[in-house]
A protein has these predicted regions:
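Membrane-interface anchor segments at the N-terminal boundary of transmembrane helices
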Residues: 43, 97-109, 338-421
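Short acidic/glycine- and proline-prone juxtamembrane loop motifs at membrane-interface regions
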Residues: 149-159
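Specific aromatic-rich, kink-prone transmembrane helix
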Residues: 120, 159-176, 184-189, 206-207
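Loop-to-helix entry region of an early transmembrane alpha helix in multi-pass inner-membrane enzymes
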Residues: 89-93, 100-119, 134-136, 150
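Membrane-interface alpha helices of multi-pass inner-membrane proteins
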Residues: 182-196, 232-236, 240
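Transmembrane-helix motifs of polytopic, lipid-linked glycan transferases
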Residues: 104-128, 139, 143, 162, ...
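Extracytoplasmic catalytic/substrate-binding loops of multi-pass membrane glycan-assembly enzymes
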Residues: 61-75, 82-101, 316
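Membrane-proximal stem/loop segments at transmembrane-domain junctions that anchor or position
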Residues: 253-371
């Protein structure tokens, strides 16, 4: 990947930002463009190989890619030729490409993207050309955080973090990047945005904040950098629509945004309040069942006979969207209060291993139906044998995650963090 080897970079002679930024950061004075000694190249190669191994270590130990409840939904998209709520077709196509080699290319892609971003971040902050430092940081993150459990699983969650970090580098550290590296970040941001509507929403929010900064101080946030961020998200939308068209043969956005907003409102009691006030209404199917609705989002979407009876997402999608949008307008104070409570609960729900179970019947069924050649390896994996436990892991990960979040205001207030690039 571009930028992983800090000794070799492309200098864009046409970009004044490149030249000025690199001179100020001192990278050119470090011997940019000069060939590295063989010993140093060997050290980099060793650091990269060991780092990649650490990032997929859980899968190596497991004997197969780690699986989640959602993994089967992604994999099924190409084979079923349909769109499913919050199951990104882009990621499903990536999984399909990885099938012949038992998904190992997918895990390596996720690990390589992570390693590249960490290396790029170190160099952008003046800590490049240190292969052992890179290896040490990857090792520390692999032991003390959930990172390798995200890079070693067939799930889009890893791209949420990668997308945010990539956007940060593109917007605020562009002076330390070559044109090739910026293009690589744009592609990675686009891919991240296309893997989940929630990730796209977060990236849009961050870009909006950058736009405000651009209006206030063009020196800190030049318009050209804002344009790159916007281009990345537009490319993400194009990727999403193109993949959906290839698979479903129609131009459509991956469904699920409003339906899962409905699910949160259902869990918070807002849907019950809405139905109590608006029923009877012949336009609302749920009026006839308002006293039978569960108060848990997972039960409603994945374990409710009533939801199945009413046609699931296809049959109730429009109605759930209407209720969700109307409820936002009618109960703004209640929405704000419940959203704040849900946010607080999510911030402390940071245990490692959520959804990594041995009873993933839907994912197992999808693998058995569409990729039967992978079933023996999948069934023999430690996860499917019930050998994975996160009790001891979370005794370390959980408090460290809370401490890290508590220290965030301190880090933000750290003098070095306030130095924006010119």
């Amino acid at each position: 990947m571009p930028g992983l080897d800090p000794g070799i970079h492309v200098l864009d002679e046409c970009s004044k930002e490149d030249v000025d930024g690199r001179n100020k950061s001192g990278h050119d004075e470090e011997g940019r463009g000069l060939p590295m000694p063989i010993r140093h190249r060997a050290l980099w190669a060793l650091a990269v190989i060991l780092s990649l191994a650490l990032l997929i270590a859980p899968a190596l130990w497991n004997g197969f890619a780690l699986l989640h409840w959602d993994s089967g939904g992604y994999l099924a998209r190409w084979y079923e030729g349909t769109l499913e709520a919050s199951r990104a077709v882009v990621y499903g196509l990536i999984l399909t490409v990885g099938v012949p080699l038992s998904f190992w290319p997918v895990l390596l892609l996720q690990a390589a993207a992570t390693l590249w971003l960490v290396a790029l971040t170190l160099r952008a902050h003046g800590l490049g050309k240190r292969p052992l430092l890179l290896l040490g940081i990857i090792a520390a993150l692999s032991v003390t955080t959930t990172l390798p459990w995200l890079t070693a699983i067939l799930l889009t969650d890893i791209f949420a973090g990668l997308g945010v970090l990539a956007l940060y580098l593109l917007l605020l550290r562009a002076d330390a990047l070559s044109r090739v590296e910026r293009l690589g970040l744009i592609v990675l941001i686009a891919l991240s945005a296309a893997t989940h509507n929630a990730t796209l929403a977060v990236l849009l929010g961050l870009l909006a904040a950058a736009a405000v900064l651009c209006l206030i101080d063009r020196r800190r946030m030049p318009l050209v950098r804002l344009g790159r961020g916007l281009a990345a998200l537009v490319l993400g939308a194009v990727l999403l629509l193109s993949a959906d068209f290839i698979v479903a043969k129609r131009l459509a956005w991956t469904p699920g945004g409003f339906t899962f907003l409905f699910g949160r409102m259902l869990q918070d009691g807002i849907v019950k309040k809405y139905l109590d006030q608006h029923c009877p209404d012949p336009a609302l199917q749920l009026c006839a069942y308002k006293d039978q609705l569960p108060d848990n989002i997972d039960t409603w979407f994945w374990g409710s006979d009533l939801f199945d009876k009413l046609g699931r997402f296809a049959g109730l999608g429009t109605e759930m969207e209407k209720i969700a949008l109307d409820s936002v307008i009618e109960y703004p104070a209640l929405q704000s209060r419940t959203a704040l409570v849900a946010t607080a609960e999510q911030l402390i729900a940071v245990h490692t291993g959520d959804g990594l179970l041995a009873t993933l019947w839907h994912t197992y069924a999808i693998v058995e139906k569409f990729t039967p050649q992978l079933v023996p390896a999948m069934r023999a994996a430690r996860q499917q044998q019930g050998e994975i436990s996160f009790t001891a892991i979370n005794e370390m990960h959980y408090p460290l995650a809370l401490i890290a979040m508590a220290l965030l205001p301190v880090i933000v207030d750290w003098p070095g963090a306030k130095q924006f690039p010119p």
